Design a protein with these regions (language model features):
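Terminal leader/tail segments of proteins
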Residues: 3-7, 11-267
Length: 267
């Protein structure tokens, strides 16, 4: 099958099927030697949840739950939740680390979100700090705010870093043996528990080979991403390239640069 490959500093050790670089691509296990873990801390941020124009939860004492292999989740004290808008449902789920969760649906202004909130009323010892706290299904709510800034996708992990560093590495991107990008001025993005990514100025990319895609995504740490496919003759490699045209203020050095998927082959 045809494939996409990315080379950096020719002659160095190959770290994977498609990447050559002296930058380690190994992921750090989230669980570590201690096995599964659940970490609960009180967030110093003012966090709000809005549904159908109404603030459902509003707290300066929300708990942030970080758990191995699970995205961070905000849990709100009962007194900071509009509990009169919640009605209990029959749904129950069980977590071997936190206990049994009960669910509530939310009704507001003629609109209803089924099983949109859950709580551990009698949690296991590891999660006792979230007893009588309520969490909300992210995508069933309309808006989430930390202080006065809207946040997207999921709660942000305060222990996660995204470092964007200028580099003079020689980077070449080849797809099906054809050079589609070459640069000596990439920006390398080092993100906790993610492989190193190489972001390339558009001037160093064969933009005439890129076709804008309808695909969109959003990262809570970097912002909204646009995608491009690569067209080589009659063959098109879908969504092979992405870039943050308007990154969040914390990542301005990524603005307008393009990155290629170099871990997967091109179908």
């Amino acid at each position: 099958a045809a494939g996409a490959s990315l080379f950096a500093e020719a002659g160095e050790t190959q770290l994977g099927a498609t990447v050559k670089s002296n930058v380690s691509q190994q992921r750090v296990p989230v669980t570590g030697d201690a096995g599964h873990w659940v970490h609960v801390s009180e967030s110093p941020r003012h966090v709000r949840v809005i549904y159908n124009g109404e603030t459902i939860a509003d707290s300066k004492h929300a708990k942030l739950v970080r758990e191995a292999e699970v995205l961070p989740v905000y849990y709100f004290p009962h007194e900071d939740v509009r509990s009169e808008l919640l009605s209990p449902s029959q749904r129950r789920t069980n977590c071997p680390y936190k206990g049994e969760a009960s669910y509530w649906s939310i009704a507001q202004g003629g609109k209803q979100a089924e099983n949109a909130s859950w709580s551990y009323q009698d949690p296991l010892p590891a999660a006792d700090a979230i007893r009588n706290h309520f969490a909300f299904e992210w995508n069933k709510m309309d808006h989430w705010l930390e202080e006065d800034e809207e946040i997207f996708v999921h709660a942000r992990d305060p222990y996660k870093r995204v470092d964007v560093l200028p580099s003079s590495r020689h980077i070449e991107v080849l797809i099906d043996g054809r050079l589609v990008a070459e640069t000596r001025r990439p920006r390398l993005v080092f993100e906790t528990n993610h492989p190193v990514r190489y972001y390339i100025p558009q001037e160093d990319v064969r933009m005439d080979l890129l076709v804008p895609s309808a695909t969109k995504s959003r990262c809570p740490y970097k912002g909204p991403a646009d995608y491009w496919s690569v067209k080589l003759g009659e063959q098109q490699f879908e969504d092979m390239v992405w870039g943050y045209m308007e990154p969040i203020p914390e990542c301005p050095k990524m603005k307008g640069l393009l990155c290629f998927f170099h871990q997967r082959g091109a179908d």
